[in-house]
A protein has these predicted regions:
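Terminal amphipathic alpha-helical/low-complexity segments used for targeting or macromolecular assembly
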Residues: 1-103
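Structural signal for interior beta-strand "rungs" in well-ordered beta-sheet cores
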Residues: 102-177
Length: 177
């Protein structure tokens, strides 16, 4: 299924670089890493977005990516930082993308945390998903994908988060309410 980008890919990339440059200095090496992994991150988002029935993620039988839709942009920033970390190893720009995600939407999802391939955010603002998420077992990851267990699977206990997989209701809810 193709992805329809609201605006254009070039426009989304220009917006990202403007956001990053407004907060940080972006070197040519960092910009090249963004260029190199932008398409891969977009493809990872498209694969995940195509599995959801959320009306904001599809349009005319195609997956929709809107850089101005906060949940989608947060997910994209994570995916881009993750792709650059795994493929390019330019951690300085990964740190800046992570910080931008925190500044833009208060989403604390570190790029070294390997999330499931298919998941979505539903009102993620203020969510914290940290390094403990990498300690999942294969059973826990299976459960996380099916939505059958609680927040401790992803190390999110005692944190409010509306992290969702494409097939589940919220995996993590407030343990403090």
């Amino acid at each position: 299924m193709p992805v329809n980008i609201v605006g254009s890919e070039a426009g989304a990339k220009a917006m990202l670089l403007k956001q990053l440059n407004s907060l940080f200095f972006i070197s040519k090496i960092e910009e090249a890493a963004i260029d190199g992994e932008f398409g891969r991150a977009l493809a990872r988002c498209q694969r995940s977005f195509s599995k959801t029935r959320n009306k904001y993620y599809s349009e005319a039988s195609a997956t929709k990516f809107d850089p101005l839709q906060g949940c989608q942009w947060s997910r994209f920033l994570y995916e881009l930082a993750r792709c650059i970390f795994v493929e390019e190893g330019v951690s300085s720009v990964c740190d800046k993308l992570y910080a931008l995600n925190k500044a833009m939407s208060s989403v604390d999802l570190y790029y070294q945390v390997a999330m499931p391939d298919i998941f979505m955010f539903d009102h993620p603002f203020g969510s914290v998903m940290g390094p403990r998420a990498t300690r999942t077992t294969s059973r826990s990851l299976k459960d996380a994908r099916s939505g059958t267990t609680g927040a401790s699977i992803l190390g999110l206990a005692n944190r409010f988060s509306c992290f969702r997989t494409a097939r589940s209701s919220a995996i993590a809810k407030s343990a403090t309410t």
